[in-house]
Amino acid sequence: MTTSFWPDGYQACFNLSFDYDSNSALIRRAPLDIVAQSRGKFAPNVAIPRILDLLDDLEIKATFFTPGWTIDQFTESCEEIVSRGHEMGAHGYLHERLAEISMESERGVFAKAAASFEKIEVKPEGFRAPYWLISDRTLELVQELGFKYDSNFMVDA
């Protein structure tokens, strides 16, 4: 008989997660492109409510990795995610490319995002880098700042 390393004899598990970017990356890249900006507003106005209803119907909990800017702009939808029992994880502030900024700037991104999470009374346990692009110091910062896990790597180990 094969022994499972999963708890209670389970043979597998999964984690359902979403990157709730809204238009955070678009604001940074194309602040004057109103057509692009309108695409980013689909998430808080249409997608998130539908996803939350579907998850409720299926009795599934998920993680929403969310930039601080999204929390600041769409606070109500973020509070709704939390009120329905889902986890929110940190995802930068304005969807920054962490590998392309200085250590000081990266620390600033984490600090600004933390302030946004404080507004909705959430201390995120997980972190996922925007674009899954980390610097050579990101993981050290994640650990230093007290996150319990990092969600950038795609392995089952």
Where on the chain are the PLM-derived regions?
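Catalytic alpha-helical scaffold of carbohydrate-active enzymes acting on polysaccharides/glycoconjugates
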Residues: 1-126, 131-157
